[in-house]
Amino acid sequence: MTNPVLNPALPAMAAAPVAATPSAVGSAGIVAPVFLRFDEPLPLASGQTLNGYELAIETYGTLNAQRTNAVLVCHALNASHHVAGVSADNPKDVGWWDNMVGPGKPVDTNRYFVIGVNNLGSCFGSTGPASINPATGRPWGAAFPVLTVEDWVRAQARVADHFGIERFAAVMGGSLGGMQALSWAITCPQRVANCVVVASTPRLSAQNIGFNEVARRAIITDPDFHGGDYYAHGTVPGRGLSVARMIGHITYLSDDDMAEKFGRTRREPAADGAYRYGYDVEFEVESYLRYQGEKFSRYFDANTYLLITRALDYFDPARATGGDLARALAPATADFLLVSFSTDWRFPPERSREMVRALLKNGSPVTYAEIDAPHGHDAFLLDDARYHAVVRGYYERIARELGLNGAVAPEGNSA
């Protein structure tokens, strides 16, 4: 077991009790992150080694005495450890899956102890390209090692060790988070009782790799990128990162959803309705995408975007089994819940059905739901009653099996 330590240089809130304090029914309450430092070197898939790193985490609910009620939530590309509740330092910062996790919600924190971990390489508190490289005293920048989904799982496992959690009641995630959950089930089968994979895929298609490459080129060719060492130049490749986000955002929405939201609505058309015959914003959808891109470029790190999209590209567990997904999933002993959405063209339902067929071939217990929803890939983040009913029902079944039908009394869990 790896023994992490809290970073003493971090603000006092980093040493606060891990369990969130509920402030209202249905809310995970006001939460603050905890920063765990791991000094044991982490071997990476690339052959490199990360000698010491920090992970930002948040938790919700209470770990029971048997340590059997823990749920790990893995995040997608631009999310973080802040899964639910309200940030202590920003009352407007609500967790990215707050509609899913909390008291009385599908993942009920009256029963479960939920952990959110900010992945290595991210820019929300865990060690990443913007962190100081102890060997140079300067930001890692382009020298930060390329990571894989499997690397993230190995790092997350050390968080489980820290809490003394031998086996998660469930590991879950949507999109890229679903890939991590799947990797957990394959690489750490004895530590995962249930695997919940939402709006995900066992590998990226050529089209998806193509989208990621176009986004990366937008960043890399930005004059302010400076080969990834823009920190030293005091610049931010904001134009490239903004375009990358615009490209990605289009893939998260369905055609029908965009048609309903924007259609061909004009942005401040001329009095006579004529086109402006220029290259500034003409349509509402253009204004929306520019806004999303510019907002994203103000809070996300460009090197992190490169790193995470490449990790997406590399995820392909069946690569080691000659493309045989059933063989790749054979080590898994967990029960599975897979959920897909009808209009998700980024990771379409057929990719989930492919995983279901492979799991059934192996004799794995599988529950599968395909939700008819108009919102595209981003549907996994939304409060859809049918979707949430499926997840709620699955977690209620886990609770019955574990005897978690009552609320877990707080015991002052801390990092």
UniProtKB/Swiss-Prot annotation:
Residues under site feature: Important for acyl-CoA specificity: 346
Record-annotated AB hydrolase-1 domain positions: 69-383
The alphabetical list of record keywords is: Acyltransferase, Amino-acid biosynthesis, Cytoplasm, Methionine biosynthesis, Transferase
Q: Which InterPro entries does this chain map to?
A: AB_hydrolase_1, AB_hydrolase_fold, HAT_MetX-like
The reply on keyword Ion transport is no
Report any one BP term from Gene Ontology.
methionine biosynthetic process
Catalysed reaction equations from the record: L-homoserine + succinyl-CoA = O-succinyl-L-homoserine + CoA
Please give the function described in this protein's UniProt entry.
Transfers a succinyl group from succinyl-CoA to L-homoserine, forming succinyl-L-homoserine.
Q: What is this protein called?
A: Homoserine O-succinyltransferase
Q: Which organism is it from?
A: Bordetella pertussis (strain Tohama I / ATCC BAA-589 / NCTC 13251)
